[in-house]
Amino acid sequence: MKKNHRHTLFASICFILLSGTILFGCGQASTQTSLKQKKFDRFLNSCFREYAAENTVTLHFKLSNPSAYGIKTPVSPTYGDLSSDALKKNCSRSKELLQKLYTFPTSSLTKKQKLTWQIFQDYLNETIMSEKYILYSSPFGADGLPSDIPVTLSEYRFDNEKDIKDYLSLVNQIPELFTQVLDFEEERRNADIVSPDFVISDTIDQINQFLNASEENNLLVESFEERLDSLDTLSEDQKASYTANNRLLITNKVFPAYEHLKTALQVSTGSKHTTSDNSTKERLCEYENGQDYYRF
């Protein structure tokens, strides 16, 4: 789902800094490290593991060997929970972490820890502030989820056979993912925050481009088979089996999911299901608090 770019930037910086703490923070001479500094490192390590394991996709792209960081990979691969309730829980969790962060006075930290403390504080504050704007973020548009998912999956790294199985499981979950997206969009509409018709129209065009591509030129087919061919640990029979499985999932799961999403969006285009005149607005800045959202 599309997110505020500043919020995403903070998340990326925070992730890098926390991972650096795991790699280097605890490796310093322990006799020269204060008790507070050790506790701070343990706190950051715990936060790092929590953020890294949010969903299978994030975990896979961020870390090649999660177990080396003490992170247990989910038994069932998942995109994570994209519901507004989950986003609100994330904001509540950020409040809890911020209070824990404040138990570490910066005067007792090293120079590097102080920098991490400051950036983590900014990130948590950004997350907390984002709660009132949760429904302002549309899952559609130029870089919305329907166009982003094929690109993201096409870049999913195959290091071993488990990666392939996890990938196919994620492909299989695209229908459920789109159901979450439509539920979120309906919640936005019920709150009188309506995606403009031109945004929905652009999204439908993206879906048509994806559906109209030939099988050989489909990104989820072409990229999958290229990555599969580069994995030397598989036999030709295994590769053929996974290739057939992937194509079957695309035909029986992915295409119908995109068709269903397209139909749902076509129904919503131009409809007036809101209780106010917001259905005529074409920019978020025209909504109440819309300009504040962009400033945020």
Go through each PLM region and give its residues.
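Hydrophobic membrane-insertion alpha-helices, especially the h-region
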Residues: 15-19
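N-terminal maturation segment of proteins
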Residues: 27-296
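Intrinsically disordered/low-complexity terminal segments and short unstructured peptides
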Residues: 7, 20, 30-32
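Bacterial N-terminal signal peptides that target proteins for export
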Residues: 2-13
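Short, cationic/aromatic linear interface patches
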Residues: 1-2, 20
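C-terminal motif of bacterial Sec signal peptides marking the signal peptidase cleavage site
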Residues: 22-25
